[in-house]
């Protein structure tokens, strides 16, 4: 007799629904007003390896300016809600707000192509493990003067928030684990904001060299006490609202030029089953240093593989934010190591006619040149209750910036108000009712500020990027038709042709 019984398999519940993130195209309406904005020529000069103090005061400090630093520009735009628009009926200030949308960008780079080298006068190298025939002599200090050319990198990231970087640093042990000074420290993965002046990943890894390499001779001078950061593309691509990276362009290339090993006591001995011991008393009785480390090289630079000095048009961003500049700000992150030439400057200390090396003083400087151009589109947002609630959940400071606030509940208590506020007979009244000032979320960070509040124009055809935008948009100047009158034809008497008679 057949008998029904419930299945023995597990019952799987449906997954918990996630909150849906809307694309900006669903609640942002684009207008047909476009503006051009461009910076002035942006220049910076400094020492390529370190910050130098040559005297007292701020002007006595020579900043560190290297071709292997991030340049993070914080572009500030005017408030479009305070604009005098050509059409007063374009938007309703009671129910709508205006925002900027980035539609085009061109990052201009001046200066010729060049390769800038870095190095260390006391670089930790023991053997040339590629071409050596004999081991180096055993001594306490085998450091040498080595210079390298770093990995070649070109990078452009555009967003309304600064980019996110990643690097490795020294971690912390558990409380029950007894730390030993001879053990390798634990590593910790960290996400930090990439700021202007941070060092890029040069081929030695994205790590905190100051805390993980205490000898200060494992890498060149400009990074031996710095942190090299690498953009966390995975984190920025997975960002819910897509504010950190509208789009990015990158090009990297590197090869290993020299192969060295490190000098020092091996912190972790090789397992004995990986090698056979040499003859007792010989140089190869015990294996030498197996800490191998190559030196990077970025190879040739060429104008055929340049990412800069050309326009880019934003039609669809990779995230949910399709180019909307919240809080009227835009962050442009640039890395270009193909123009990293370091100037060697020489001055004579005496007027001697013969050359003597000690009579000259040598200096190093590095210069950079930038030019930023943008095309912005004016957009508006219909502030319905649903959209306002969504924007408040996305960023609660956005509505406050638009002068929309949440009204406090009505108070039933009776408040006190003094007549003489400056009187010493009453308690101090300072700060009792003063509103809290707006706090800049990036006040403690370093960026290169580019102010475009007075540099926007609707005359796109008067600027190079504006003409390129009009050309790709299909707008062309109208050709003036010149009417030319044709001269009246002169009447000629028709000539009668006679036929020849056939015989």
UniProtKB/Swiss-Prot annotation:
Keyword Disulfide bond assigned to the entry: answer is yes
Region feature Disordered, mapped onto this chain: 475-503
User: Got a GO cellular component term for this one?
Assistant: host cell nucleus
Give the multimer and partner information: Self-assembles into homopentamers. The capsid has an icosahedral symmetry and consists of 72 capsomers, with each capsomer being a pentamer of L1. Interacts with the minor capsid protein L2; this interaction is necessary for viral genome encapsidation. Interacts with protein E2; this interaction enhances E2-dependent replication and transcription activation.
Coiled-coil spans in chain: none
Q: What is the lineage of its organism?
A: Viruses, Monodnaviria, Shotokuvirae, Cossaviricota, Papovaviricetes
Its protein name is Major capsid protein L1
Asked if tRNA processing is a keyword of the record, the answer is no
Q: Which HAMAP family match?
A: PPV_L1
The species this protein belongs to is Human papillomavirus 62
The stretch of residues making up the signal peptide is none
Q: Which GO terms describe its molecular function?
A: structural molecule activity
Q: Which UniProt keywords apply?
A: Capsid protein, Disulfide bond, Host nucleus, Host-virus interaction, Late protein, T=7 icosahedral capsid protein, Viral attachment to host cell, Viral penetration into host cytoplasm, Virion, Virus endocytosis by host, Virus entry into host cell
What parts of the sequence cross the membrane?
A: none
A Pfam family found in this protein is Late_protein_L1
What the record says about family reads:
Belongs to the papillomaviridae L1 protein family.
State its role. Answer: Forms an icosahedral capsid with a T=7 symmetry and a 50 nm diameter. The capsid is composed of 72 pentamers linked to each other by disulfide bonds and associated with L2 proteins. Binds to heparan sulfate proteoglycans on cell surface of basal layer keratinocytes to provide initial virion attachment. This binding mediates a conformational change in the virus capsid that facilitates efficient infection. The virion enters the host cell via endocytosis. During virus trafficking, L1 protein dissociates from the viral DNA and the genomic DNA is released to the host nucleus.
InterPro entries referenced in this protein's UniProt entry, alphabetically: Capsid_L1_Papillomavir, Capsid_L1_sf_Papillomavir, dsDNA_vir_gr_I_capsid
Q: Which BP terms in the Gene Ontology apply to this protein?
A: endocytosis involved in viral entry into host cell; virion attachment to host cell
Q: Where in the cell is it found?
A: Virion; Host nucleus
């Amino acid at each position: 007799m057949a008998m029904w019984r419930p299945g023995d398999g597990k019952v799987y519940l449906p997954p918990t629904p996630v909150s849906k993130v809307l694309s900006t195209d669903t609640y942002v309406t684009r207008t047909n007003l476009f503006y051009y904005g461009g910076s002035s020529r942006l220049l910076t000069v400094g020492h390529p390896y370190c910050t130098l103090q040559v005297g007292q005061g701020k002007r006595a400090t020579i900043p560190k300016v290297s071709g292997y630093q991030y340049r993070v520009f914080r572009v500030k735009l005017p408030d479009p809600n305070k604009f005098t628009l050509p059409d007063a009926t374009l938007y309703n200030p009671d129910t709508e707000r205006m925002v900027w949308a980035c539609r085009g960008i061109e990052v201009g780079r001046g200066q010729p192509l060049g390769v800038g080298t870095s190095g260390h006068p006391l670089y930790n190298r023991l053997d040339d493990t590629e071409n050596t025939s004999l081991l180096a002599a055993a001594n306490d200090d085998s450091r040498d003067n080595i210079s390298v050319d770093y990995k070649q990198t070109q990078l452009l990231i555009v967003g309304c928030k600064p980019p996110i970087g990643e690097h490795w640093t020294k971690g912390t042990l558990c409380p029950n684990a007894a730390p030993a000074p001879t053990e390798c420290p634990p590593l910790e993965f960290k996400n930090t904001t990439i700021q202007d002046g941070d060092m890029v990943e040069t081929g030695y890894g994205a790590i905190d060299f100051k805390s993980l390499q205490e000898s200060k001779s494992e890498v060149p001078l400009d990074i031996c006490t710095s942190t090299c950061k690498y953009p966390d593309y995975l984190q920025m691509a997975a960002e819910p609202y897509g504010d950190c990276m509208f789009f990015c362009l990158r090009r990297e290339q590197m090869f290993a030029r020299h192969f060295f090993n490190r000098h020092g006591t091996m912190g972790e001995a090789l397992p004995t089953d990986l090698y056979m011991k040499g003859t007792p008393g010989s140089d190869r009785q015990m294996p030498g240093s197996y800490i191998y480390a190559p030196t990077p090289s970025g190879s040739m630079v060429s104008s055929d593989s340049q990412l800069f000095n050309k326009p880019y048009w934003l039609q669809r961003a990779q995230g949910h934010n399709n180019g909307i500049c919240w809080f009227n700000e835009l962050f442009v992150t640039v890395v270009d190591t193909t123009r990293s030439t370091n100037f060697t400057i020489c001055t004579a200390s005496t007027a001697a006619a013969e050359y003597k090396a000690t009579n000259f003083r040598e200096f190093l400087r590095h210069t950079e040149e930038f030019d930023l151009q943008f095309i912005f589109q004016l957009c508006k947002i219909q502030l319905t209750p649903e959209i306002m609630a969504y924007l408040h959940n996305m960023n609660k400071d956005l509505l406050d910036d638009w002068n929309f606030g949440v009204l406090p509940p009505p108070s039933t208590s009776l408040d006190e108000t003094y007549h003489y506020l400056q009187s010493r007979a009453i308690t101090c009244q300072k700060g009792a009712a003063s509103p809290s000032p707006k706090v800049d979320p990036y006040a403690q960070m370093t960026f290169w500020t580019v102010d475009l509040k007075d540099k926007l124009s609707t005359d796109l055809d008067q600027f190079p990027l504006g003409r390129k935008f009009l050309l790709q948009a299909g707008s062309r100047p109208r050709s003036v038709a010149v009417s030319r009158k044709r001269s009246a034809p002169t009447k000629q008497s028709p000539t009668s042709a006679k036929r020849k008679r056939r015989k």
